[in-house]
Amino acid sequence: MPIYKMDKKKDGVQKYRVRINYTDSKGEAHQMDRVAYGLAEAKELEARLIFELNNKSNSSKMTLQELSEEYFNAKKHEVRETTLDKSRRLLNSNVLSLLGEVRLDKLDAKRLQKWKNEISEKDFKLKTRQNIYGDFRSMLNYAVKMEYIPKNPLLTVGNFKDSYDFTTPQDKLHYYTPEQYLKFSAVARDSARSVKEWGYFAFFAIAFYTGARKGEINALKWSDIEGTTMHIRRSVAQKIKGKDIVETPPKNKSSYRDIVIPQPLMTILEEHKARQKAMPGFSEDYRVCGGIECLRDTSIENKNKAFAKAAGLPHIRIHDFRHSHASLLCNEGINIQEIARRLGHSKIEMTWNTYSHLYPREEERAVQILNQIK
């Protein structure tokens, strides 16, 4: 790694060329040339370039497991704890379990395509596979940002696609019609023989009549209800490793919202609150559905299955009560912007892409209007 004296000078100061020869992780030879003025500056430049190359070489020998630890430590200051925990679980189960010991400089397209094929063979929905890819891509983008690798090799193999999935969005959407919900609700009410059981009855009523998310409903306190208005200001998560229940902000800025409570739900909440008030230590800080503590996700799902079975209804997910709320409003022709607002969607396109097929067909009415122009 010599320093060459050049013919040219600048203001009487000798000009030097610093030349560094090195081999990259693929075994290819490279040469780096830099110019310095004065022998002291040239030696300093040489030392710095050697240090940077060695540091870069060592970084490229970092394993994916080691990278993930640094990545998660950096991300914890940028995203919500629940988001980070979900990303960690996805990467641990589907990336690090397969590639954790692979060095960054050995992570090539062939190895990544093999990984992608393995994930494709798992019984995952397309969205889940794409979420895994997205988190993996984000981690490798971090490696590029930190100059551990020159480019993201995952981009070469591309995201997951499902060319055999011809199911339309409406075929995938599950929800209860108003008639089905009333059957479900009747069973839930009949089983509500205690204050806690009433909490489950109230939970499903809130889900259907407001379209709120599970975590938002579970986080609700009586202080969040003023008259006939429900204020969505927080959420709770129950799947963060090493923790019980964590209260978090809502999913996004649009999720902070006020929802007018319809009368059927208001009647249920008033009766439920009267029952809770009889409990020792009641306060406005009580959770609407759980009282002192939030209802457990597993318990909510168990009740959901039991009520559906008793009512002779197909089982739908907790999140599908949100779809039930939205589908009812769509079928009644409610403006898509209002539905997006009630659901707390950050983009109206999300609401439209999910529910537009539920709107009443306007073709016949459009033709009638045009037929009048003669």
Locations of regions flagged by a protein language model:
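Catalytic-site neighborhood detector that most strongly recognizes the C-terminal catalytic loop/helix
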Residues: 78, 235-236, 266, 343-368
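N-terminal core-binding DNA-recognition domain of tyrosine site-specific recombinases/integrases
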Residues: 60, 72-148, 153, 170, ...
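Basic, Lys/Arg- and aromatic-enriched nucleic-acid-binding interface segment
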Residues: 126, 130-134, 145-151, 155-214, ...
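Active-site/catalytic core of tyrosine-dependent DNA strand-transfer enzymes
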Residues: 89, 177-182, 238, 262-314
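C-terminal catalytic core of tyrosine-transesterase DNA break-rejoin enzymes
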Residues: 145, 201-216, 303-308, 322-346, ...
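Conserved tyrosine-mediated DNA breakage-rejoining catalytic core shared by Y-recombinases
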Residues: 158-159, 219-274
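N-terminal DNA-binding module of tyrosine recombinases/phage integrases
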Residues: 9-110, 274-282
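DNA/chromatin major-groove-contacting recognition/catalytic segments
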Residues: 241-248, 332-334, 353, 357-374
